[in-house]
UniProtKB/Swiss-Prot annotation:
GO terms for molecular function: acetylcholine receptor inhibitor activity; toxin activity. Its main location: secreted. The modification Glycine amide is found at residue 64. Both the globular (with C1-C3; C2-C4 disulfide pattern) and ribbon (C1-C4; C2-C3) isomers shows no or very weak activity on alpha-3-beta-2/CHRNA3-CHRNB2, alpha-3-beta-4/CHRNA3-CHRNB4, and alpha-4-beta-2/CHRNA4-CHRNB2. Belongs to the conotoxin A superfamily. This is Alpha-conotoxin GIB.
Length: 66
């Protein structure tokens, strides 16, 4: 391949990567907000020494009945 062809392929790859990355970043913003909300809910339960999540259930009791 010539230098022009290699440069053209490089530009196409960069453009395709940029176009593909935009929708995934927008979609992750909403999920991050939800994860932060769930994390704060978990912190509130841990403060009460109560947690039904399997990640913290072995250290705290689960009175919620989950």
């Amino acid at each position: 391949m010539g230098m022009r062809m290699m440069f053209t392929v490089f530009l196409l790859v960069v453009l395709a990567t940029t176009v593909v990355s935009f929708p995934s970043e927008r979609a992750s913003d909403g999920r991050d907000d939800t994860a932060k909300d769930e994390g704060s809910d978990m912190e509130k339960l841990v403060e009460k020494k109560e947690c039904c999540n399997p990640a913290c259930g072995r250290h705290y009791s689960c009175k919620g009945g989950r």
